[in-house]
Amino acid sequence: MGRFDGKVVIVTGAARGQGEAEARLFASEGAKVVLADVLDTEGQAVAADIGANARYVHLDVSNEAEWQAAIAATKDFGGRLDALVNNAAIIWPSAIEDTSLEAYMMVINVNQVGCFLGMKTAMPLLKESGGGSIVNISSIDGIASKNGLISYTASKFAIRGMTKTAAMEWGRFGIRVNSVHPGGVNTVMGNPINDPILETMPYQQQAIQRIGYPNEIAAAVAFLASADASYITGTELVVDGGWLTGRLEPGLPGSSATTEGFGYNA
């Protein structure tokens, strides 16, 4: 018996990376999964590999009409909806003064507007199905910012806030809404040049000194979508290896990288 036997789940951005891992995990635990993306060739291949319990739909998450079509396809496929994972996202690093309005809005439309439209259009079918769960993928950059990520950070902070508003409004319908805040993840977005050095080097000052992997984020998402999290809503689940917890200082005791310095010896 799987946690999602008889359940129907939509995952956006499911053609590869983190979204693919989420879709595969839901399917492995018994769910019918609708994989939504704009990468049609990749998405269709993943759905075919999962098998009869998966269906691929083309979805530009910034397009309301395409969302409505995706929800209709989901109802046709599974007859209901139990969970939505708003995973689709893009990133466009640039300094504020070098960011055009067009580039800024491109990220906002996918990340923030896409999440809004997903919640809005999925809610009636979730309600009709007796309630369910929405998991919105934010980021550690929706809690603490970085330079060069003005549009991405704005969108991820917005997702954090929208999640709480939706949780407040829809709890009466049995719909829980939570956000997941990954740190670095070994995907095309998190490690775009697929360099093994980037799996460890940037993370030497966090508690778990490596990049995260898609299956680790998927596990957190599945938990929040499941009955195991039945009394959890409006919350933020940080999955970042301790990035936001603090920084290991090599000049102080308690680090494997401790060196002579600050009056301390290794």
Label every PLM stretch briefly.
Residues 85, 171, 176, 232-234:
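Short, small/polar-rich loop/turn modules that mediate ligand/substrate recognition or access, typified
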Residues 124, 168-169, 230:
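Alpha-helical segment proximal to the catalytic Tyr-Lys
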Residues 2-34, 166:
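Canonical Rossmann dinucleotide-binding motif of NAD(H)/NADP(H)-dependent dehydrogenases/reductases
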Residues 95-96, 103-105, 202:
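Substrate-binding pocket helix/loop in short-chain dehydrogenase/reductase
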Residues 119, 155, 163:
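Active-site helix of classical SDR
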Residues 139:
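Residue(s) in the substrate-gating loop at a strand-loop-helix junction
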Residues 179, 200-232, 239-241, 266:
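C-terminal helical subdomain
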